[in-house]
Amino acid sequence: GVKELVLAGMLLASRDIVGGIEWVAHEEDKEHIDKLAEKQKKQFAGCEISGKKLGIIGLGAIGAMVANSATHLGMEVYGYDPFISIDAAWNLSRTIKHSKSLDEIYSQCDYITIHVPLTDNTRKMIDKEAFTKMKDGVVLLNFARDLLVDEEALVEALDSGKVKKYVTDFANATVAGRPGILVTPHLGASTEESEENCAVMAVKEVRDFLENGNI
């Protein structure tokens, strides 16, 4: 579900795969496209994620899965979560580094992904001040809630080059079609497996309420 989409987002932000696909689709000279591709491919070059530093804000179920998967892809993973549960902590790879503050994530990481709930305290937590603390050319991913990011500050960070790419699952007028932003139409749980799991979870919760009175 969401974990796979986050990993895909990192890959799409690292290499201009989307641009390459669009070039192939719109190139009119299909007869010689194989030779043209060799000449044009340089403009779609990027970097590998292996060896890069990934900062994960929020190590709940999804954040922990992203962290573990990223280590298998060769990334150096940093996690920040002052409220991490015991279960989540036990499930984390030992190679994941514990960050004591958000500033550590901002200053050290090439990629940052957010996995926290939207509350009064987290609303627009990624603001102008946060962007100034990040590395130049950082890639920011948001598959949690759109309002976690101050989009006005985000646009400024993109225009200045502070942020290389912003990848999000929440389309709106500010981000849709804007250079430097990759937007998917809320696809996080749009898989056959996720929908089935949601249905099973709903049945279990109803049964727990009827049998035990738990809400």
Predicted regions and their residues:
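Glycine-rich Rossmann-fold phosphate-binding loop(s) that bind the pyrophosphate
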Residues: 52, 59-60
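Rossmann-like adenosine-cofactor binding region
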Residues: 82-174, 190
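Phosphate-binding beta-alpha-beta segment of Rossmann-like dinucleotide-binding domains, i.e.
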Residues: 1-53
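NAD(P)-dependent dehydrogenase/reductase Rossmann-like domain
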Residues: 176-179, 187-215
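N-terminal Rossmann-fold NAD(P) dinucleotide-binding loop
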Residues: 63-64
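Short beta-strand "acidic-cap" motif of Rossmann-like dinucleotide-binding folds
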Residues: 77-79
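Aromatic pocket-lining residues of Rossmann-like dinucleotide-binding sites
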Residues: 69-70, 134
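Oxidoreductase and adenylate-handling cofactor-binding alpha/beta cores
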Residues: 3-22, 70-75, 201-214
